[in-house]
Amino acid sequence: MEGIDLGNAFAQSLSGLGVPADVARALWLPLPMIVILLTVTVGVIAAVWGERKWSGMMQQRMGPTIIGLGGSIQGAADGVKLLVKEDIIPVKADPWLFTLGPAIVIIPVFFSYLVIPFGQGLVLSDITIGIFFIIAVASISPIGALMAGYASNNKYALLGGLRAAAQSISYEIPLALSVLAIVMMSSSLSTVDIVEQQETLGLFSFFSWNIWRQPIGFVIFLISALAETERAPFDLPEAESELVAGHHTEYTGMKFALFYLSEYANLILASLIASVLFLGGWSFIVPLEPLAALFGIEASNPIFQVVNALVGISVTILKATFFVFLAILARWTLPRVRIDQLLDLGWKFLLPVSLFNLLLTAALVLLSNTLKTTLPLYLPLIIFVGLVFVAMSLQKRPAAKPTAARA
């Protein structure tokens, strides 16, 4: 099923009301970014509340409880607080670069949401190079972080900016290679096509999700995405014990809020991309269309289309929430790594493994096309399970302490 062109649908709806076609298309232009801005802002508020609550549960405390029902609008209150705080620019800072830094960090994140499908036919822009667009746009944000660190005229901020740039470059390559393996299997760069490729087994589409075909790529993507979003244990650019607050040490007010917003917007974006690439996007464990066909319900039924759209949106959000929870869990269970360990992990381990995974995927796709079956694509799952089993078998167990002899 092809995605709906929301732009043309919007223009046709207004044209039916007597609005000129050119005016209707002009009215559509700002709407996608407005929708994204509102959606991401609400998502960030929910993510901040969820992280504070889950963090409180892990530490056996309550978390926010005062502002709103159960502290649900604590994030919005913090945003208003930052909005009205004084905007200070250090005397010796470069005012132009200091101001542009936060904007260059946050703007590419919003553009990336344009190609994320939230449901079947619910994507603002289904361009044929969607995944390539996300990777290309995401590479702009480190420039803003480096610019902010340099313009602050602060040694800690500069070191934070340099760390952010080095970390981003180190992990963009393994992340891109893990995504490229998915692209090879689906033969498309479109995010919608990648999701639809994971629905090829009808009622058993759960087993066609890419997580079963690309377990190695999935682990590489998770680690790389965590590093790209600068979340613990990879929060080296703003390590409080070393760099105060990294490249946003000198920022206050709304400029600081933009950095804060970009961190959680990046986390949500990475979670959505992971759900689209590896967990079937809007696909439920049992797809609704084949299930409805068993009961004689046609896919063109308006009620079914509404239910299918709502289920798709809910499933996408739930899958993304699962990845956000994993990121929060990693923050409170794993210690922060050193900068040399971070770079070694990216260049000496993830990069070779991602290259191996890409070459293996290419060979299996060729074999699958030759044999006219998708069974060879599940070989990485067997390899991954075998490696996990070997690693667990070789794990050193502490020697038992000798029991003291009784007198």
Curated annotation (Swiss-Prot):
Q: Where in the cell is it found?
A: Cell inner membrane
Query: How is this protein situated with respect to the membrane?
Result: Multi-pass membrane protein
* Pfam families listed in its UniProt record: NADHdh
Family under the similarity heading: Belongs to the complex I subunit 1 family.
* Alphabetically ordered keywords of this record: Cell inner membrane, Cell membrane, Membrane, NAD, NADP, Plastoquinone, Quinone, Translocase, Transmembrane, Transmembrane helix
Regions that span the bilayer: 28-48, 96-116, 127-147, 175-195, 203-223, 267-287, 309-329, 347-367, 374-394
Q: How does it assemble?
A: NDH-1 is composed of at least 11 different subunits.
A GO CC term assigned to this protein in UniProt: plasma membrane
Reaction catalysed by this chain? a plastoquinone + NADH + (n+1) H(+)(in) = a plastoquinol + NAD(+) + n H(+)(out); a plastoquinone + NADPH + (n+1) H(+)(in) = a plastoquinol + NADP(+) + n H(+)(out)
Gene Ontology terms describing biological process: aerobic respiration; photosynthesis, light reaction
Q: Name the Gene Ontology molecular function terms of this record.
A: oxidoreductase activity, acting on NAD(P)H, quinone or similar compound as acceptor; quinone binding
> What does the record give as the function of this protein?
NDH-1 shuttles electrons from an unknown electron donor, via FMN and iron-sulfur (Fe-S) centers, to quinones in the respiratory and/or the photosynthetic chain. The immediate electron acceptor for the enzyme in this species is believed to be plastoquinone. Couples the redox reaction to proton translocation, and thus conserves the redox energy in a proton gradient.
> What is this enzyme's EC?
7.1.1.-
Q: This protein is called what?
A: NAD(P)H-quinone oxidoreductase subunit 1
Please name the gene that encodes this protein. ndhA
Q: Which PROSITE patterns match?
A: COMPLEX1_ND1_1, COMPLEX1_ND1_2
